Amino acid sequence: MNNVEKAIEALKKGEIILVYDSDEREGETDMVVASQFITPEHIRIMRKDAGGLICTALHPDICNKLGIPFMVDILEFASQKFKVLRELYPNDIPYDEKSSFSITINHRKTFTGITDNDRAFTIKKLAELVKEGRFNDFGKEFRSPGHVTLLRAAEGLVKNRQGHTEMTVALAELANLVPITTICEMMGDDGNAMSKNETKRYAEKHNLIYLSGEEIINYYLDKYLKD
């Protein structure tokens, strides 16, 4: 069993894995868990040990069925009325051409939406809604803005973009899980992202699968080309 296959099995068990994108991109490691298995404990670990922004990444097919746009598209549309939004357009991202950010949500049964319990509840209920195919109930169950940031994966996943969003959703797809993942960047104590060596040591200490973006991309594309 290779490293990607080990990661797939870990995701199926509801375990956290670590994914490093590449030296040429963000140079960051994300904690990753399959959203259908999310628990408040996962959120707590991400919040305390990773410290970045906890986001939930969705397959583009799911986004299309839910009607969820990219945030840049919302800004562009709204800029017709609010000129400042045109000035804020993110056309100078140093590591990519376009951000994967979409909307933020809370489940309507949450209180503030920010607690570990509330965020886990929102994410799990989103995965349940998608798994059950209840796309028309999205607006009934969730409100926006909220405390769970949604990321919209690019069409074709890693064939067209090699961000943590696409790589982790591709892993969930390979695992035959609901293709939604919850991810969080690992931050260091020096004001920067945690180094690759530090995140590798963290993985070893906590017995977590650690893999690179290159491993995921090659495995996914190889399977895609064969199929």
From Swiss-Prot:
Effect of residue 28 to Q: Reduces activity 23-fold
Phenotypic consequence of residue 28 to D/S: Loss of activity
Outcome when changing residue 30 to E/N: Loss of activity
Residue numbers binding D-ribulose 5-phosphate: 25-26, 30, 161-165
Pfam families registered for this protein in UniProt: DHBP_synthase (PF00926)
GO molecular function, one term: 3,4-dihydroxy-2-butanone-4-phosphate synthase activity
The protein's name in its UniProt record: 3,4-dihydroxy-2-butanone 4-phosphate synthase
Species whose genome carries this gene: Methanocaldococcus jannaschii (strain ATCC 43067 / DSM 2661 / JAL-1 / JCM 10045 / NBRC 100440)
Taxonomy of the source species: Archaea, Methanobacteriati, Methanobacteriota, Methanomada group, Methanococci
